[in-house]
Amino acid sequence: MRARRLLCWWTPNAFNSLDRQAALWNCRILWSRASLFLFNTYRGYARIFVKGVAQPVLSREGTTQGDPLAMLMYAVGVLPLVRKLKERGFCTQTWYADDASAGGKVGPVREWLNALIQDGPMYGYYPEPSKSIVIVKDGKLEEARAAFAGLDMEFVEASRFLGGFLGKEDAVRHLLEEKVRKWVEAVEDLAEAAEVYPQDAYVCFIKSLQCEWGYVQRVVEGAAEAMDPLDKAIQDKFLPAVFGREM
């Protein structure tokens, strides 16, 4: 994303605060094929048992944890909000589950934020500034702080974003190197396990661990250049432990 500012916005427990009645109605209009099933699922109130409370608490808002369609219902429930913000053309926005972000110049991003704060509660979406981040790519931190004055937000030059990293090149490289260091430690731990359980360690490696850096290499430009310590750990420690001999 080539935006000069990127605002990453989080809202706490959004799945629990979603306006259920509005979400079910939106599903009736936008996802009619599943609307009857969702209505039957949520026509009653799930009981929540809280330690120290004699009577169960009835879940009247949001989606129920464990519901296979909870994520899909939430997505349809906030879709009108997403479309409303998009139609006003403030800036480029990205939504993933209950996390929202917007990229662009500082003025339009602030207008997008004001609209989100104003319209979000109507859909059960309650933004929380203290858990939000403003990524400033060109080093103008003071300008960004002035634009978002009054909001307890974090201002950085680089940060994680949707599993990758975004921001100033040097800062992104530092974050990436820290991530690679943790991967090297994980590979070394798997190498120790591979001496006794080589097949299990190999399955953990190909099914889980390598997927992490495989994704980062796809979404972070130049990530492969920082992977040399990881390549060395795999070649010198993990593979010899799996095969029981030097490679």
Predicted regions and their residues:
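Nucleic-acid-interacting cores, centered on viral/eukaryotic replication and modification enzymes
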Residues: 1-247
